[in-house]
């Protein structure tokens, strides 16, 4: 049996009804980002491998599809994340001194899916703010992220917050290899106490105790006060907890409908984050529907270190979580060569109407569009009448 019609695992066609919903959401989110002052950029899907891996942290290379450029012989990759590309654009092509707000929307490709029911070809929408190190930029990005989920129609959203500086402060002065740090981060995120105890057995007592405490620091805003009592009074730890508390206060005031949570041990999927990180969860999805945070070091790989904060989400995932929007009713029109008919159809389309012309021989066929009106001739005029 031929398999020419089969697609690779976790790769799927997007059919008309879903494609329409994705495109409507894409336009809506880009318009929303523009209302915040964001400028649209469109990085290439294909880029030199070393550029795609710059500043992304350990473990990123395994997600990239790789190939050899037949023109130059260099290694190329299909992007798995757009953020490094936007950092390159900010650092080299725009090269501005002040605040730069950028947004993007395009496909990314993963060698492995992030979850059991996720696509290996997400349609990634994201926003980045460069040039401001203060919490004001973090708050603006989080406001924008929550607005995006609201526009998508998601209900019962929970925003989960953490900070990479907590682990940095706890591990300050402790030399760990990249592999050891990755294993430790994974154990913390999974709250695997047995593995964590094994990995920390040879560390200084104060460091070990703090690492064993981190997995228990999750819950509501009260977790921040508990963390102050139980974690070392390191400057990075104190700054992280103070910033999280400041953000929690502002978010609760502006978005009272959002549940706020904290998981101070979860950093597994935030390889290049340097400060505040956040993720959003919604009813009907076990994994986060949106991730973001601060990554001030990402531009250094391109020769220009700039404060940076942003988020990204997958439009395909969002569309799958909300009820389908009704298709806008259309106007049915006969096919004809008369100039007056063609002008009437054109005028309706210019007014924003969907006009479906019934081709000869197909008058009795149903179409996908819900036509509730038809274009008919009355005397010498073409008029729209209800069906």
Give residue ranges: language-model regions.
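Short, surface-exposed recognition loops or helix-turn segments adjacent to catalytic cores
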Residues: 156-167, 184, 260-267
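Extended alpha-helical scaffolds
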Residues: 152-156, 165-170, 180, 194
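Beta-rich nucleic-acid/ligand-interaction surfaces
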Residues: 43-61, 162-172, 266-274, 367
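Structured core elements
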Residues: 42, 66, 77, 158-160, ...
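TRNA-binding/sensing appendages of the translation machinery
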Residues: 1-84, 139
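Cap/lid and interdomain-hinge subdomains that line or gate substrate/regulatory clefts
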Residues: 133, 137-138, 160, 167, ...
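Positively charged, Gly/Ser-enriched RNA/tRNA-binding surfaces
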Residues: 18, 24-36, 47-48, 83-96, ...
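Acidic, His- and aromatic-enriched active-site or binding-groove loops in soluble protein domains
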Residues: 63-71, 175-199, 204
């Amino acid at each position: 049996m031929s398999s020419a019609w089969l697609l690779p695992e976790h790769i799927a066609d997007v059919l008309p009804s879903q494609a329409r919903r994705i495109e409507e959401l894409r336009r809506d989110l880009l318009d929303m980002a523009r209302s915040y002052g964001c400028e649209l950029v469109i990085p290439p899907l294909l880029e030199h491998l070393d550029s795609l891996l710059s500043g992304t942290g350990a473990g990123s290379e395994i997600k990239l599809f790789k190939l050899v450029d037949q023109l130059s012989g260099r290694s190329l990759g299909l992007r798995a994340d757009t953020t490094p590309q936007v950092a390159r654009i900010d650092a080299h092509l725009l090269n501005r001194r002040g605040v730069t707000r950028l947004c993007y929307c395009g496909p990314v490709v993963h060698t492995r899916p992030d979850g059991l029911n996720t696509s290996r070809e997400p349609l990634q929408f994201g926003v980045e703010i460069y040039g401001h190190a203060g919490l004001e930029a973090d708050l603006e990005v989080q406001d924008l992220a929550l607005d995006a989920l609201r526009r998508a129609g998601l209900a019962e959203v929970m925003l989960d917050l953490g900070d990479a500086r907590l682990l940095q402060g706890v591990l300050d002065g402790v030399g760990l290899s990249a592999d050891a740090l990755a294993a430790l981060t994974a154990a913390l995120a999974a709250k695997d106490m047995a593995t964590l105890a094994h990995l920390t057995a040879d560390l200084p007592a104060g460091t070990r105790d703090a690492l064993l405490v981190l997995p228990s620091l999750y819950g509501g805003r009260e977790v921040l006060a508990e963390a102050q009592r139980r974690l070392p009074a390191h400057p990075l730890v104190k700054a992280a907890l103070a910033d999280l508390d400041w953000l929690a206060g502002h978010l609760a005031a502006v978005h009272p409908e959002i549940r706020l949570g904290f998981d101070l041990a979860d950093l597994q999927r935030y390889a290049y984050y340097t400060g505040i990180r956040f993720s959003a969860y919604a009813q009907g999805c076990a994994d986060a529907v949106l991730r973001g945070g601060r990554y001030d070091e990402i531009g250094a790989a391109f020769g220009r270190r700039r404060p940076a904060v942003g988020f990204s989400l997958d439009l395909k995932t969002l569309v799958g979580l909300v009820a389908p929007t009704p298709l806008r009713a259309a106007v049915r029109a006969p096919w004809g060569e008369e100039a007056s008919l063609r002008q009437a159809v054109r005028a309706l389309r210019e007014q924003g109407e969907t006009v479906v012309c019934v081709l000869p021989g197909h008058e009795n066929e149903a179409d996908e569009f819900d036509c509730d009106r038809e274009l008919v001739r009355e005397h010498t005029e073409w008029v729209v009448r209800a069906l």
